[in-house]
UniProtKB/Swiss-Prot annotation:
Functional note: Could be implicated in the processing or the export process of the nisin lantibiotic.
Biological processes per GO annotation: peptide modification
Gene source species: Lactococcus lactis subsp. lactis (Streptococcus lactis)
InterPro entries in UniProt: LanC (IPR033889), LANC-like (IPR007822), Nisin_biosynthesis_NisC (IPR020468)
Domain of life from the UniProt record: Bacteria
Family: To B.subtilis SpaC and S.epidermidis EpiC.
Name of protein: Nisin biosynthesis protein NisC
Amino acid sequence: MRIMMNKKNIKRNVEKIIAQWDERTRKNKENFDFGELTLSTGLPGIILMLAELKNKDNSKIYQKKIDNYIEYIVSKLSTYGLLTGSLYSGAAGIALSILHLREDDEKYKNLLDSLNRYIEYFVREKIEGFNLENITPPDYDVIEGLSGILSYLLLINDEQYDDLKILIINFLSNLTKENNGLISLYIKSENQMSQSESEMYPLGCLNMGLAHGLAGVGCILAYAHIKGYSNEASLSALQKIIFIYEKFELERKKQFLWKDGLVADELKKEKVIREASFIRDAWCYGGPGISLLYLYGGLALDNDYFVDKAEKILESAMQRKLGIDSYMICHGYSGLIEICSLFKRLLNTKKFDSYMEEFNVNSEQILEEYGDESGTGFLEGISGCILVLSKFEYSINFTYWRQALLLFDDFLKGGKRK
């Protein structure tokens, strides 16, 4: 009975989202809104949601909406072009959202081929023009940078892009080397992503989060290794990254906490000097995201200590849930639940079952509390929350939406090239 209620509740919210997007695309037919084309806030996330929720009752309706939204995206791309190849704001995000359709229709295959060619152009241009002195998170991170693009590219089983994957892996690996006495990933104050972060880190910092920092780079290097794309330098970089977390874990007994950013004098003295002003237990920053680094790193390097610690990090974070005051994926409860689900799938652990069950039981309340002000986006809006809830009601996955979150269901399967 509860399952039927959950499905009805999800369906009601999806219909509301469709109505909002139908109206929005109608009004903006002759205008350009960059956000509409992004995985973060736009139609790619809606396409993923609809594809996952298709069943015998609504398959034709949802597929028609998917086709309409893809046509809308193509019309905008034809007129305005692409601004970036990134996962959350550009070509990689659009490509990921339609990748599951590549065998269904020749037009989708052609669109993917076009997007992939642009991604290759974008990556090569970015790396060729890169200046280490001006490095900023969008150069390398998951959201806007090459780590996110690589996560998408590793889904493509096409030798044509093997060199491109290795090019990104080498680029990311080199960023763990020293530059002027600091790791190359150290970001100057003026190169932070926002004015508030520049003010927070007047001396610059090494970002320790998953979304914009060191953990995200480590996760994608570990996954690339499992997929058969690695070398001595990338494995050394992965080890170096994890050792940084080992060295700078806050000295609070069995808390498994890290600061969001490390400052130059801390890195040089190899110890935490400044007190953390704020700690969040989320996908984007904090223990949950870092637990993925330890999990993937441990599996890739065959290190049981790292794998065991990954589970402890996540367990501690789930008990605290610091700074978690919403249901979004990025820095809310949905993101935590998806990480818990991954640990269950990869490690066959039951330690997080109670959190997942509680989330499922409260699904109706969760969707009711998720107001219109939260938006419909994938990363911070209700469509992402619905995707997380949907896995409790629909057992088959049709798309690759978890890949965008560095949640690699196939990590144990590998997929190395023969």
